[in-house]
Amino acid sequence: MPSNVVRVTAASEPDKPAFVLHDHRKPRPHFDLRLEEGGVLRSWALPRGLPTRSTENRLAIAVPDHDMDHLTYFDADKSIADTGWWEEHDRSERRILFTLHGSSGARRYALINTGSDWLLHLTKDQAD
């Protein structure tokens, strides 16, 4: 296995779509959330990372889709902060409700399309 590729948790859930959260240090520190969908990774840059309370929203800037090899990619400026699988609960043009099942458990989020950007919200109702 090349030195910049790691095994992902999602491999133990082969029928579930994977996600990865990258800790990206350049051009300025931010996180990238990538959700497997339709053979690509839909991606959002998170300048302040994942929300930690349901009372806050975090800006999520949609960026171009990435190839599936980014599930395991890291380099000197990008590390894998978390990985696992995700499940969608509801979707409309303006909102995606989903749960990330990562290394520290399951957390439910909503991605809300504001028209110009997205907001990432940690929901009050969390997965059991």
Model-derived regions: residue spans:
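A charge-rich, low-complexity, intrinsically flexible signal that marks solvent-exposed coils, linkers
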Residues: 1-128
